[in-house]
Curated annotation (Swiss-Prot):
The lineage of its organism: Eukaryota, Viridiplantae, Streptophyta, Embryophyta, Tracheophyta. Residues 1-24 form the signal peptide. PANTHER family: OS03G0336100 PROTEIN-RELATED (PTHR31189), VICILIN C72 (PTHR31189:SF41). Keywords: Glycoprotein, Seed storage protein, Signal, Storage protein. The gene is CSV. InterPro entries: Cupin_1, RmlC-like_jellyroll, RmlC_Cupin_sf, Seed_Storage-Functional, Vicilin_N. Glycans are attached at N130. The keyword Glycoprotein applies. It comes from the Eukaryota. Residues 154-303, 350-513 form the Cupin type-1 domain. This is Vicilin. Belongs to the 7S seed storage protein family. Residues 119-145, 308-345, 424-452 are annotated as: Disordered.
Length: 525
């Protein structure tokens, strides 16, 4: 039997059905988008990079590819959202319904579109935040590793160079409080650049890691000036006025600086006699009366000089401690300098890489200057070292009897591995319940005595790794690139280096891979 229906009822029913199908289509699209959430795909891609990549460089390239794919998926999803929104509006206009119903339909399309767009933006910011927190957590879990991009603080920067300083060693790494008085810093100057004269309240050792230049420093007694290149090490007494010139026409001059402050432990400052911006001249802190007397100059002349500096400051803007040097200026400074000695002596500069290597074979070389043989390093009780590992080579496991070594990577990629008892105690201590803090520490030490945890860190240019005294450590280069590093041994007087695997000191991955396998839980060290 056929039942007759009112045309009006049929029309209303058709409109309601169309509107429901339209809204369900938008909702289904939303579900489809979240089912293939780019953020989830990005996280899966990152996990694959971490598990499948065998080298640090390979992992970085993989992660960059994940980032590009994620952004491309975001762009495509945004375009798809726009297309679906326009289709939704078009269907609303095509329906034969009143203006009010049509506006409700279009408003529903707009709300769905904005909700999904807002969700995608939140996902993007959340995944960036989570990634940053993950990197910070990795550094907290490895207090001996200081990655370049998170650990250095820039003190001075302009167009011609920069000066940056590593965070204090024990700032986030309590096991390193024994070396917290030392600071590591970096100068980087463009070709043909002059670094303004300055002095600092710290003993310092300058290690040239790249480029060519001239380092000059003046004390109250004499003046020392050296033409330097990669491998040159210069000891600079506290309070010496230092100025540096980058001579090369192509390469930047980079210098690693180890400083031992003489005022506040772990804190030192640079003082500039001349400057018109950042840095400022320390003469500006003195009154005209003092300057008139000291320089035997009338106040009008001093005001003229200071006003001229203020004018330069306004004209030159951000010009700072790094200035472009003229060729004749560079020649004049370099002609007055001498070359460092190859061997020990009273002079304050040597070329470490010109010495005979302490260890050497076809897989790598290791150079070292100890305070027993080089008197200029005795004040700071520091040894300076450098090593080069060929592709796939291993610096076999060893430990130092007294010295803690701060290793700075200059070129190439690789890894460091170390056996650490401190992290083993921390990991077990963090898992225990709420006990008295002192009892917890005592129990943790008793339970983990003689147990070790493996510390592993990827190494790339600019990274820093610290190997404390007594900790067995090894370094190995990636399979496709050599690994170059310089190191400062702190508390190095009468230090001995003990190799766990005997000779040879450098191996290739193919020769013997067993030497890098640490036992992370052992009954004896």
């Amino acid at each position: 039997m056929v039942i007759s229906k009112s045309p009006f009822i049929v029309l209303i029913f058709s409109l309601l059905l169309s509107f429901a199908l339209l809204c369900s289509g938008v909702s289904a699209y939303g579900r489809k988008q979240y089912e293939r959430d780019p953020r989830q795909q990005y996280e899966q891609c990152q996990r694959r990079c971490e598990s499948e990549a065998t080298e640090e460089r390979e992992q970085e390239q993989c992660e960059q590819r994940c980032e590009r794919e994620y952004k491309e998926q975001q762009r495509q999803q945004e375009e798809e959202l726009q297309r679906q929104y326009q289709q939704c509006q078009g269907r609303c206009q095509e329906q034969q319904q009143g203006q009010r119903e049509q506006q409700q339909c279009q408003r529903k399309c707009w709300e769905q579109y904005k909700e999904q767009e807002r969700g995608e933006h939140e996902n993007y910011h959340n995944h960036k935040k989570n990634r940053s927190e993950e990197e910070e957590g990795q550094q907290r879990n490895n207090p001996y590793y200081f990655p370049k991009r998170r650990s250095f603080q820039t003190r001075f920067r302009d167009e011609e160079g920069n000066f940056k300083i590593l965070q204090r060693f024990a700032e986030n790494s309590p096991p390193l409080k024994g070396i917290n008085d030392y600071r590591l810093a970096m100068f980087e100057a463009n070709p043909n650049t002059f670094i303004l004269p300055h002095h600092c309240d710290a003993e310092a050792i300058y290690f040239v890691t790249n480029g060519k230049g001239t380092i000059t420093f003046v004390t109250h007694e004499n003046k020392e000036s050296y033409n330097v290149q990669r491998g040159t090490v210069v000891s600079v007494p506290a309070g010496s006025t230092v100025y540096v010139v980058s001579q090369d026409n192509q390469e930047k001059l980079t210098i690693a600086v180890l400083a031992l402050p003489v005022n506040s432990p772990g804190k030192y400052e640079l003082f500039f006699p001349a400057g018109n911006n950042k840095p400022e001249s320390y003469y500006g802190a003195f009154s005209y009366e003092v300057l008139e007397t000291v320089f035997n100059t009338q106040r009008e002349k001093l005001e003229e000089i200071l006003e001229e500096q203020r004018g330069q400051k306004r004209q030159q803007g951000q010009q700072g401690m790094f200035r472009k040097a003229k060729p004749e200026q560079i020649r004049a400074i370099s002609q007055q300098a001498t070359s460092p000695r190859h061997r020990g002596g009273e002079r304050l500069a040597i070329n470490l890489l010109s010495q005979s290597p302490v260890y050497s074979n076809q897989n790598g070389r290791f150079f070292e200057a100890c305070p027993e043989d080089f008197s200029q390093f005795q004040n700071m009780d520091v040894a300076v070292s450098a090593f080069k590992l060929n592709q796939g080579a291993i610096f076999v496991p060893h430990y130092n009897s007294k010295a803690t070594f701060v290793v700075f990577v200059t070129d190439g990629y690789g890894y460091a591995q170390m056996a650490c008892p401190h992290l083993s105690r921390q990991s077990q201590g963090s898992q225990s319940g709420r006990q008295d803090r002192r009892e917890q520490e005592e129990e943790s030490e008793e339970e983990t005595f003689g147990e070790f945890q493996q510390v592993k860190a990827p190494l790339s240019p600019g990274d820093v790794f610290v190997a404390p005294a007594g900790h067995a450590v090894t370094f190995f280069a990636s399979k496709d690139q050599p690994l170059n590093a310089v190191a400062f041994g702190l508390n190095a007087q009468n230090n001995q280096r003990i190799f766990l695997a005997g000779r040879p000191f450098f191996l290739n991955h193919k020769q013997n891979t067993n030497v890098i396998k640490f036992t992370v839980k052992a009954s004896a060290y």
